[in-house]
Each structure stands twice: as structure tokens, then as C-alpha cells.
Amino acid sequence: MQTYTDSLAHLQDELRRLDSMLRLHFEGAGDGAAASKDGFEGMYISAEDVSRLLEPDREQRTVTNEQLRQQIDDQATRLRDRVSLSYQQGTPIRFAALADSFALSRPELDAVLLALAPELDQKYEQIFAYLLDDITSKRPTVGLILRVLSHTEQERLASLTHFSPSSPLVAHGLVELHPDSPDVPTLSQSVSLDRHIVEYLTGTDDVAGSIADFARLEESPTQATELTLEARTQTRLDSLVSDTVDDPTIYYLHGPSGSGRASAAEAIAASVGLPRLVVDTPRLAGTALDTVLAQLTREAMLKSACLQFENVDALDAQDADG
């Protein structure tokens, strides 16, 4: 079994599995639907179009739903094995890392995949338009996602929690729901993937544009000799980190300018092998702080980084002056 060369190669395999899942849903939906819309003369998506998009090399053969389910299970097993092997060989897979960072279940990760698909291949716009019987629909709805992912009505109803305000998908801003009007039911709302999550999954390493004015990602030194700390201070920090490494911890580093606070922050991050998302705290003044803090937290989780707020004292001074 080969490892993945990169995260994009893995996404291609994920899309093949998605095609099988959509094929299963398509076969179960029957051939009665077709996407058309008054005022869009000449635009029409047929069942044959969808079948060709899902299996362009498919020969004329009968595939049962049970065979499709087995195919999906086999694809999932191969994906897990190749991802595991890739990590062992030193190739991280961003789609898997997203699941780990935000504790996503496989159904939630599949919801991400369905929302991501139109960003990677325009054929999914046509497939979703057909399945929703609306030529203007380019993205999946909550209802369609749940139908594709669920085998029974009970599963479908239970899966609504994946799109509740407290769910990882919504609470961390991974997906966005788009109601046409305030009273549109959740099931009818279209789903898109947050733009920065799309960028991350497709290989971009930049910090999210919404926080780029006041946050930057910095790699931590890999060797203690790269730091300018006294041996006693380094030993104390090592002991402190060792006692708290398994728990989310806030370290407050204080002292006058030049006392080594920045070096201490680098040492803490280096001791756990993580980069730092460094925030210029005074520049947060005047922002919607709750929203910004949520975005910073998401970015730190996405990048597996320590969140470091610098120049906090300057913000206190601004408040005093105000």
C-alpha cells in the first residue's frame, strides 16, 4: 500500500468515496427527478448526466445498493489505512488533521467533504442541482447532506445535531449556513465551507485574512541553544511545562522590557514542539472581541499552535488613557 504524497492526493480519494455515497443516494432517489427551472431555457440536468458525472468510466452493468455500501466501506478502510501509513512516514494529511483538531466525527467530516466538493470540482454543482431539483442550487443543503449520510429516518433526524449552534461544525465556524430568509427551516438552508478552511485544506499556510492584521504564525526554536535564557530560568520553565503539559494552560509572563518574556514564550512552545500564533494585543482595541477571539482560537487549533498575546500591558495603558 502506498502512502499519500500530499493532502491533495488524499482529497482525490475522499472525493471518489463521496462519488460512491452520492451514487447510492442517487440510485435510491430513482430517475423521476430532473433539475430544470423556468427562465433557464436550454439548461437541464438529466439522470444520465448525473450518472455519467459520478461514474464516467462505468460500463453498462447493474450494481446493487448492497454492493455500493460495501464499496463505500472498502474505500473508507483503504483511506484510513493510507492516512495512518502516511503519518507514519512523515506526511501529515490536512483533512485528517482537521478532524483531530476539532474532534469531528466521521459524519461531520463527511459533511465538510460535501461542502468542500464544489470548491474542488464544478461537477458537484450539477449533481447537487439535480438532487435538489433546482438548477440554481450549486451547494448542498442541510437536508441533502443528512440524506446522503444517513441510512434511516431515525439516523437523519438524530444527525440534525451536527448543524446545531453548539456543534463543532458551527461553533468553530467551519461551515456556514445560508437561509434565503429568516424563517427558512434548517433542512432547507444551503451549506458552504468557510473560505479559510477551504484554503487550509487545499494547501494554503497563511493566517486567516480576518486576523492577519494583528496575528502572525511563528515557528518555535527546535534547540534550547537557540534561546537566550539563563540556565536557571530554562530549568524552571521546563519543570512548569512538564507539570501542565496534559492540561490546557495559560502562562502569564510578566516583567519589564528586556526581561526575557518573549524568549520564555518561545521556550514554552519549543518544549512542546508547537509553533506560536502571536497576537499584537493592542491592535485588538476597537474590534468585536468575542468574534476575534473565536477566530484566533480556531486558527490556533487549525495550526496546532500555542496562542501568544504580546504587549498586553500596552492594552491596559490604552484603557487607562481612555
Predicted regions span which residues?
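Intrinsically disordered, low-complexity N-terminal extensions of AAA+/P-loop NTPases
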Residues: 1-322
